Every structure is written in structure tokens, then in C-alpha cells.
A protein has these predicted regions:
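Venus flytrap/periplasmic-binding-protein-like
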Residues: 125-140, 245-273
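Extracytoplasmic "Venus flytrap"
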Residues: 32-37, 41-65, 78-85
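An alpha-beta-alpha
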Residues: 51, 66, 149-196, 303-323
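Periplasmic-binding protein-like
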Residues: 98-107, 128-130, 175-177, 225-241, ...
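Short, well-structured alpha-helical segments in soluble
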Residues: 86-101, 116-121, 215-229
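Hydrophobic alpha-helical segments within soluble ligand-binding/sensing domains
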Residues: 36-37, 135-142, 148-172, 281-302
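Hinge/cleft segment of the Venus flytrap/periplasmic-binding protein
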Residues: 296-343
Length: 343
């Protein structure tokens, strides 16, 4: 049994293309991890947490703080996941290591574990999984057995209110495009936005979002609905590629004087302007929160399915200050509300 005090670690202090073939790693480690992903030396008899993740820097930030908090109570093994990683590699790691819990970072890793579960329907018990750094976990969770996690999406209203505190232009009406599978998510976001006197105007598109359909939907929001801002969901079908972004979002925003709120930091870049403002989880804090969740699951028999998906407890704001200042005006205290100002 993990001490209760461990569950609270870090909480008092605390209150957005992400994907090697398996190669030999350090002791207790699986997958093609670099030296920077070396796992702590294993101890006999301790339960093990398997971390399946892409090797990129943002994921390493989460992993680093997670391991710092759990390594005294758990052995840790890291499986690096890339575009060439297959379901069998996940299965081999589980068979060899018998993990007490699996941390799944990003949607590709979740898909691999789901494939593994579906390919072994007669398995009596799958290791519980904690999903982090993945889009729309509430929608993913029903497709997994014994899973919970921490949402990556910060509620839209949080971003809208933060944007409103930064720019002089009004933020009363925000437009969003979504696919049918996100209907319930959008309904929840509308309710939250109303509490802050912000109207969320939503346009539903088909399951497969063709560029012309997305562009016409964005045009309707900008020209007909005259929204004050646009919100881009963390949905791969709405982003797809740089070329797709050029044909859709950039094409419609080129002549529109509205900010674009995004949910991943790499879309806010003054050198290739697109996203104006982002509110994202603090990755170090996300690792600590993941550790806390693992301790809670350990104390409660690893019943992940009984634990609700959590919201991130610490967030950061990023802004293309050059764009915001030129197009929408910055309030006098704007920089006090921005954690990372880009120009």
C-alpha cells in the first residue's frame, strides 16, 4: 500500500505531431529511448509503472516530473512510441514487465493500447491505464478497458476569459467548428461560456472535414455570425497538415480581424502567424498530477474505471503579442496575464 501522504505530493505547491523502433535501452527500459530517457535503477519487489510515450521534449517534461515523484515507490520503465511502433511492442512490454499501471501519452499511444486490448479479448485483466497528453480523453475513455486520465483541453471559457483580460477588442461571441463526435463536448462548453456572458456559436461539419467545407463554415462564422474570436479544437481532422491549414484557417483569417484561440503551443508562432492565443496545461505540473493520480489508483485497488477524468490543475498562457498588439490592442496590464509572450 502506498502511503496516503504520497497522494498529496506537489498539490499544495501547484494550487499541441508528437510520436523508434524498439532497441536496447538501459536496465528496466524498453523501446528506443535516448540517454535522456534513462529509467531509474529497478528495485526487487516494487510495483512497476510502464510509461508509453513519444520521445519529444514536451512529453519528456511530463515524464521527468512524474518520475521524480513516483520513483521511491515504483519501478519505472519507458517505452518510446513513434510512427513505426506497433501494437505487438506494447504487448511484449506488458508480457515482460507485468506493469501495475500504464501511462499512455498521446492519441497514437492510446490507439496502440486499444488495439492490444481488442486483439486479446480473452485476457482476464488488463493493466489500468492513465491517459495524459492526449486530445479529448472523455471521448477516448469508453474505447479502453479500465482507464482514466487527465484532460489536455483546458475548458474553452478559460481561454476566452484570459483573452478578454489581455486585449482591448471585445470577446463576447466566439465561433467554433466541430465534428459530430464532439457534440456533447461542445454542449458542455456552451454552458460554461454562458456563465461568463460569452456566446459560443458552433457549426457542425461532417466526420470527414474537407477543406472547402471547413472554409465555408469558418466563413459563415466570420462574415454571417460576425464572431469576435475563433476557437480551434485539438482535433486532427481540423488541422491535418500545414497545407491544409493554409487552405482553410489561414485563408479565412487573412482578411478577418479576429483572434484565433488554439489548444496547442506550436500553433502560436509569430514567424508563421496563425494562433493568436493559447491556454495549455503546465507540463511539469501535469507530471505531478499524473503521479498523484497513480498513487490514488494504487490505494484503491487500481480501479481506474471508477476514477473520473480530471482537468489539469495548472495552466499556462501563450500569446503572439505582436499580432495581438497590432490587430486588437493590448490592455495596460496584458503582460501580467501572459506566461509566455512571443514576438
Amino acid at each position: 500500500m502506498v502511503p496516503t501522504s504520497k497522494r498529496l505530493v506537489g498539490l499544495a505547491v501547484l494550487l499541441g505531431g508528437l510520436f523508434g523502433c524498439a532497441t536496447a535501452g538501459t536496465r528496466g527500459q524498453v523501446g528506443g529511448a535516448s540517454e535522456g530517457l534513462a529509467d531509474p535503477p529497478p528495485r526487487a519487489g516494487d510495483p512497476l509503472v510502464l510509461i508509453a510515450m513519444p520521445p519529444s521534449a514536451t512529453f519528456q517534461d511530463v515524464r521527468r516530473s512524474l518520475i521524480t515523484e513516483i520513483q521511491r515507490d515504483f519501478n519505472v520503465s519507458t517505452l518510446t512510441v513513434t510512427s513505426s511502433t506497433g501494437m505487438d511492442e506494447i504487448g511484449a512490454a506488458i508480457a515482460r514487465l507485468s506493469p501495475s499501471c500504464i501511462v499512455l501519452m498521446n492519441n497514437t499511444t492510446v490507439s496502440l493500447y486499444r488495439e492490444y486490448q481488442h486483439a486479446h479479448p480473452d485476457t482476464a485483466k488488463f493493466p489500468p491505464s492513465v491517459v495524459v497528453m492526449a486530445s479529448f480523453i472523455d471521448e477516448l475513455r469508453p474505447t479502453l478497458i479500465n482507464a482514466t486520465g487527465i484532460a489536455y483541453e483546458v475548458p474553452g471559457v478559460t481561454a476566452f476569459v484570459d483573452l478578454r483580460s489581455v486585449i482591448k477588442a471585445p470577446v463576447r461571441k466566439v465561433g467554433v467548428v466541430y465534428r459530430p463526435s464532439f457534440r456533447q463536448f461542445i454542449a458542455r462548453q456552451k454552458e460554461l461560456a454562458e456563465k461568463e456572458q460569452i456566446e459560443l456559436v458552433a457549426v457542425e461539419v461532417g466526420k470527414g472535414v474537407y477543406a472547402d467545407r471547413l472554409r465555408s463554415s469558418l466563413h459563415a462564422l466570420l462574415v454571417e455570425q460576425k464572431v469576435d474570436a475563433l476557437w480551434m479544437l485539438n482535433d486532427n481532422e481540423l488541422i491535418k497538415s500545414s497545407e491544409y491549414l493554409d487552405q482553410t484557417w489561414r485563408a479565412e483569417l487573412r482578411n478577418a480581424n479576429v483572434p484565433l484561440v488554439v489548444g496547442v503551443p506550436n500553433l502560436v508562432n509569430p514567424r508563421t502567424p496563425l494562433g493568436s492565443f493559447a491556454v495549455v496545461p503546465d507540463h511539469e505540473a501535469l507530471g505531478l498530477q499524473t503521479a498523484n493520480l497513480i498513487f490514488e489508483l494504487a490505494e484503491n485497488g487500481w480501479h481506474a474505471e471508477n476514477h473520473a477524468v480530471e482537468l489539469p490543475i495548472s495552466i499556462k498562457t501563450l500569446a503572439d503579442v505582436k499580432q495581438l498588439r497590432a490587430k486588437f490592442g493590448l490592455k495596460d496590464d496584458a503582460l501580467q496575464h501572459i506566461d509566455r509572450a512571443l514576438e
